[in-house]
């Protein structure tokens, strides 16, 4: 069912909330008449922080205006006349409003659609059994909303009590003035004759005694009212503090944790809109109570009555100031983090947001935010409130930005779009620590006032740890530092402490999360894959994942010490696997055509009972980012064959699918899938031209093919009658009359015992590709394509 149809079925408060989303910035009539068109557009695909996306936003604005104009033109009849005028007016209005800022239209409609979906979900969940509540409306969120309702009612009650107290006090003051008037009348009695004076004096005395008795009683009542009201405020503040703790220390901290895990490839942290609505409700209720407390203080000053209320009010006033201070400083957050691997002299972006900016009217005098980079030690000093003013670790260009208020969404934020780290000052490193293990952070700070400069707040927030690099070759190791920090940092830590060791299952979870995100695949690491990785990391032969569950992995094992017998670390090897999959092999991994995480012996064990021509692809043990083909073909010389690993460089010349297509003797993808069934959809189409056909410039275009000459010879010697593409005649080149590009002596790609030695191997395929990739000499003799 369309979202707008469901939204129209909302009732009560949900309906009012939905209606409040619309106004002059986006009329509800536009939503109604263009509902289908609006819901079919890809609003979420536009990056609001990327100025280059402005073209897409402009196209959406133009499309919206055109659809409105079309809808207006189709209105006929008496009833349609007014609607035609109205829709035409809205088209002009939206064009004028968003013509210079089309991104704001996208932001506005995204905000509307998100909240409509939320309201519909909440309404549907409310009518469902308690056990089937959706994630958007958890039991905890229900409790938060119930507490807000309780706070609203309590605040209404104290407002009524305050008005009642004010009326009572005003009447008391009137009566007190009456008692003063009676005292003045006593002074005038001396002017009267004795008989009249005595008569008037008796009446005045009776009236005075009665009034003073009332005043004494009412003074006690007023004092009691004041104390009771102060006690109610104390209870309100206790509930407010508890609610604020849940929102800031639980919900907001959880959002920040999700944001950090998203840096490792976890699910997106989610919108801040719900959190902002809670923070705004907190701000509104806190401010209402603060104003009530101030009015109560004013009443006490207006009519001083000795008692404990002055001390109580001083306490609640200090408490509520602390509460609003904590709310203001804690809701100054980084909505979009800067990159955690930060290269100098490279543009980067970030967004900070104040969740209570709209409710506290901060946007009336927009504050400026400044970004600076500080070291780990400087961050520690900052949190200890030590003086770190002007103590920075580098220079950031374009590091100041004024916060902007977006009326449609009610957000106050600063978008840093063109920052660049000009230089970095590194600290002395400890022991074996490398530059890619040194952590920095971006400090965002600002100052703003609320309540007409009544309260002034200095706010600061730190980004997630960043590792600064100066060259792309450092990216791999810097990413390892970020991954470890994001995955294993503990709550409430001192910047930026992380455990030196973690359990293997914890690392498995982090690796799987990163793997799926980098490769952009739902096919993550299986139990068998994790066993292989554990064997590699711990240099173990156990095939049971449970055997590794209690084992710890140190940071040094992860990315400081090389693997046994290798010149690279565990992380560097794993990152190379992700890199080659992401750039060239993603569809094949998703198809399940790459087994990947098996060693040479395991590959042979898997192939031993398979028919000749069965092959599998596995990640190379010897070369970072390499993938090799292992296949079975029982010849006189050997049974298993292993091709020299391909890397990203090879696949940028010729794809894996085309390379496999060239090797006709590879028939089945392990375990038993026909090769062409798996890979044919990825083959590069071959033009239907005669091989001898000449191009316009007189040259013949060569073709690159994957060949394994030694295997051709071995398979022929074994009695194979197949005709291979690899056996096509090689081109000849002068000065040798018949230079054989594929010599018949034993080839270094495949060694005689079936083991591949990287150091002693020549990559024939690469040599051929490089040769064919050069400008053609006129002495090349073309041959027909086989």
From Swiss-Prot:
Signal sequence range: none
Location of the protein in the cell: Cytoplasm; Nucleus
UniProt entry tagged with the keyword Membrane: no
MF (Gene Ontology): chromatin binding; DNA binding; DNA-binding transcription activator activity, RNA polymerase II-specific; DNA-binding transcription factor activity; DNA-binding transcription factor activity, RNA polymerase II-specific; DNA-binding transcription factor binding; double-stranded DNA binding; identical protein binding
A single Gene Ontology CC term: RNA polymerase II transcription regulator complex
InterPro entries recorded: p53-like_TF_DNA-bd_sf, SH2, SH2_dom_sf, STAT, STAT5_CCD, STAT5a/5b_DBD, STAT5b_SH2, STAT_linker
Disulfide bonds: none
PROSITE patterns in the cross-refs: SH2
Positions carrying Phosphoserine: 128
Modification after translation, per record: Tyrosine phosphorylated in response to signaling via activated KIT, resulting in translocation to the nucleus. Tyrosine phosphorylated in response to signaling via activated FLT3; wild-type FLT3 results in much weaker phosphorylation than constitutively activated mutant FLT3. Alternatively, can be phosphorylated by JAK2. Phosphorylation at Tyr-699 by PTK6 or HCK leads to an increase of its transcriptional activity.
Residues where Phosphotyrosine is found: 90, 682, 699
Residue ranges occupied by any SH2 domain in the UniProt entry: 589-686
Cross-referenced CDD domains: SH2_STAT5b (cd10420), STAT5_CCD (cd16855), STAT5_DBD (cd16849)
Keywords: Activator, Cytoplasm, DNA-binding, Nucleus, Phosphoprotein, SH2 domain, Transcription, Transcription regulation
Keyword Transcription regulation: yes
SUPFAM superfamilies per the UniProt record, alphabetical: p53-like transcription factors, SH2 domain, STAT, Transcription factor STAT-4 N-domain
Quaternary assembly: Upon activation, forms a homodimer or a heterodimer with a related family member. Binds NR3C1. Interacts with NCOA1. Interacts with NMI. Interacts with SOCS7. Interacts (via SH2 domain) with INSR. Interacts with CPEB3; this inhibits STAT5B-mediated transcriptional activation.
Reported function: Carries out a dual function: signal transduction and activation of transcription. Mediates cellular responses to the cytokine KITLG/SCF and other growth factors. Binds to the GAS element and activates PRL-induced transcription. Positively regulates hematopoietic/erythroid differentiation.
Name the UniProt record assigns to this protein: Signal transducer and activator of transcription 5B
Organism annotation: Rattus norvegicus
Gene for this chain: Stat5b
């Amino acid at each position: 069912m369309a979202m707008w149809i469901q939204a129209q079925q909302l009732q009560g408060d949900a309906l009012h909330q939905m209606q409040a989303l619309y106004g002059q910035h986006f009329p509800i009539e536009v939503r109604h008449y263009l509902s289908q068109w609006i819901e079919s557009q890809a609003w979420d695909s536009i990056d609001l922080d990327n100025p280059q996306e402005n073209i897409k936003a402009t196209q959406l604005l133009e499309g919206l205006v055109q659809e409105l104009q079309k809808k207006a033109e189709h209105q006929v009849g008496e009833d349609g006349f007014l609607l035609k005028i109205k829709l035409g007016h809205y088209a002009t209005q939206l064009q004028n409003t968003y013509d210079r800022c089309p991104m704001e239209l996208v932001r506005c409609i995204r905000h509307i659609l998100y909240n409509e979906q939320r309201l519909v979900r909440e309404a549907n969940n409310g009518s469902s059994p308690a056990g089937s509540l959706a994630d958007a409306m958890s039991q905890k969120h229900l409790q938060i909303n119930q507490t807000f309702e309780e706070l609203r009612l309590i605040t209404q009650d104290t407002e009524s009590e305050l008005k009642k107290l004010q009326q009572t006090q005003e009447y008391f003051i009137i009566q007190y003035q009456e008692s003063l008037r009676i005292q003045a009348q006593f002074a005038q009695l001396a002017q009267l004759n004795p008989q009249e004076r005595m008569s008037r004096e008796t009446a005045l005395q009776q009236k005075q005694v009665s009034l003073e008795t009332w005043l004494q009683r009412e003074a006690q009542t007023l004092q009691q009212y004041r104390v009771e009201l102060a006690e109610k405020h104390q209870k309100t503040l206790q509930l407010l503090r508890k609610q604020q703790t849940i929102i800031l220390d639980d919900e907001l901290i959880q959002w920040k944790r999700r944001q950090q895990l998203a840096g490792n490839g976890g699910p997106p942290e989610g919108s801040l809109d719900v959190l902002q609505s809670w923070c705004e409700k907190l701000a509104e209720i806190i401010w209402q109570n603060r104003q009530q407390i101030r009015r109560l203080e004013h009443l006490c000053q207006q009519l001083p009555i000795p008692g404990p209320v002055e001390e109580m009010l001083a306490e609640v006033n200090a408490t509520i100031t602390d509460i609003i201070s904590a709310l203001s400083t804690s809701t100054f957050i980084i909505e979009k983090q800067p990159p955690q691997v930060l290269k100098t002299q490279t543009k980067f972006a970030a967004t900070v947001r104040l969740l209570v900016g709209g409710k506290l009217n901060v946007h009336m005098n927009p504050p400026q935010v400044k970004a600076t980079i500080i070291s780990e030690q400087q961050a520690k000093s900052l949190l200890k409130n030590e003086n770190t003013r002007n103590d920075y670790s580098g220079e950031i260009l374009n590091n100041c930005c004024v916060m902007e208020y977006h009326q449609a969404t009610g957000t106050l934020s600063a978008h840093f779009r063109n920052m660049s780290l000009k230089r970095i000052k590194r600290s002395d490193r400890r022991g074996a620590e490398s530059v890619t293990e040194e952590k920095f952070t971006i400090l965002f700070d600002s100052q703003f006032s609320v309540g007409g400069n009544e309260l002034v707040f200095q706010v600061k927030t730190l980004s997630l740890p960043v590792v600064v690099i100066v060259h792309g070759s450092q990216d791999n190791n810097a990413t390892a530092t970020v991954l470890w920090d994001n995955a294993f940092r503990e709550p409430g830590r001192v910047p930026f402490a992380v455990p030196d060791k973690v359990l293997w299952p914890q690392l498995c979870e982090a690796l799987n999360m990163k793997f799926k995100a980098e490769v952009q695949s739902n096919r993550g690491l299986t139990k068998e894959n994790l066993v292989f990785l554990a064997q590699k990391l711990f240099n173990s032969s156990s095939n049971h994942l449970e055997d590794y569950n209690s084992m710890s992995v140190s940071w040094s094992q992860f990315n400081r010490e090389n693997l046994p017998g290798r010149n690279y670390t565990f992380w560097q090897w794993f990152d190379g696997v992700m890199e080659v999959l992401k750039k060239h092999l993603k569809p094949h991994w998703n198809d399940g055509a790459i087994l990947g995480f098996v060693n040479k012996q395991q590959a042979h064990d898997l192939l031993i009972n398979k028919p000749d021509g069965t092959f599998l692809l596995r990640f190379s043990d010897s070369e970072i980012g390499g993938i090799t083909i292992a296949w079975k073909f029982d010849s006189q010389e050997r049974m298993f064959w292993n091709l020299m690993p391909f890397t990203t460089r090879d696949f940028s010349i010729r794809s894996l699918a085309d390379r496999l297509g060239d090797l006709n003797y590879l028939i089945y993808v392990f375990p038993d899938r026909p090769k062409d069934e798996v890979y044919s959809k990825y083959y590069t189409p071959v033009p239907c031209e005669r091989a001898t056909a000449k191009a316009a410039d007189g040259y013949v275009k060569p073709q690159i093919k994957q060949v394994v000459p030694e295997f051709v010879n071995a398979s022929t010697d074994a009695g194979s009658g197949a005709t291979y593409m690899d056996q096509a005649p090689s081109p000849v080149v002068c000065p040798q009359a018949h230079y054989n590009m594929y010599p018949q002596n034993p080839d270094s790609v495949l060694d005689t015992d079936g083991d591949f030695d990287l150091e002693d191997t020549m990559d024939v395929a690469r040599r051929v590709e490089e040769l064919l990739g050069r400008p053609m000499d006129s002495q090349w003799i073309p041959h027909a394509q086989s």
